[in-house]
Design a protein with these regions (language model features):
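Short, low-complexity N-terminal intrinsically disordered segments enriched in polar/charged residues
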Residues: 1-45
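Active-site rim elements
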Residues: 26, 55, 142-144
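Short, cysteine-centered beta-strand-loop-beta hairpins and adjacent loop/turn segments enriched
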Residues: 135-147, 175-177
């Protein structure tokens, strides 16, 4: 039987849906600005069993999730330093401090769409799924490069001390490929010796796993992240984490 809600319950649920979309949107915005120091402390639950997932595995537990954002911030600072060193004679760099130049060599735009949000019947949690398309441009070991990142963001959120916080967050990428090339072919952009210092490694999951397989011409059908569906409590439904 379809769940019936009072006008007040409907209003409360609309506010929760708005909050869920705002929180995950703010996380995406911080990623676009490399403001990684703001993400964990402002938007994640303080519970120990939080989980952050990517195609190649999970960051499981509070320390691992916080460590991911700490490493992303360190990488952004390292990129700034490398850009300042390589182009130290450029007028836009001369006389500037690292703090003033933070974010140099990096720009990202993320478009999130097709939101699906389900609020639990007990109104203590919510599940959400988006598709997204991002253009990630930065100086890399292959030189300055723009990369399409297209896929899904999925999240479990919980109410914690009167505020909504992320418990699990999953990024499932279908496309991770340079913008100027067909997705059906291997990339022709190889390492460039003069940019070798820009080979900055991404954080490695603490629980390696093939969570999701990116598109390739001969990829078998890849089931997308499960769509949120009506549920009673978070304990009684599936999870976007492990």
């Amino acid at each position: 039987m379809k769940q019936q809600f009072t006008p007040q319950e409907m209003a409360d649920r609309c506010l929760i849906i708005r909050e869920v979309q705002n929180i995950v949107g703010k996380v995406a915005h911080c990623d676009m600005l490399a403001d990684y120091d703001l993400v964990y402390k402002n938007f994640w639950s303080t519970q120990e069993d939080v989980c952050l997932g990517f195609n190649n595995g999970y960051f499981k537990g509070a320390a691992a999730v916080k460590g991911y954002y700490d490493q992303k911030l360190a990488n952004a600072k390292k990129l700034t330093e490398l850009v300042m060193e390589k182009w130290k004679d450029h007028k836009d760099v001369q006389g500037k401090t690292a703090a003033e130049m933070f974010g140099a060599g990096y720009v990202k735009g993320t478009d999130m769409h097709t939101p699906i949000v389900e609020v639990a019947q007990d109104m203590k949690s919510a599940k959400a799924l988006w598709q997204f398309q991002a253009a990630d441009t930065r100086v890399t070991a292959r030189g300055p490069l723009s990369v399409w990142k297209i896929g899904y963001m999925a999240a479990d959120l919980i109410e914690e001390d009167g505020q909504w916080k992320i418990k699990n967050l999953l990024y499932a990428l279908d496309i991770d490929h340079p913008c100027a090339e067909p997705w059906t072919e291997p990339s022709k952009y190889g390492p460039i010796p003069e940019f070798a210092a820009f080979d900055i490694p991404e954080p490695e999951p603490t629980v390696p796993a093939e969570v999701y397989k990116a598109y390739a011409p001969r990829r078998p059908y890849q089931e997308p992240p499960r769509m949120p569906e009506p549920y009673t409590t978070l304990a009684e439904t599936f999870s976007y984490g492990i």
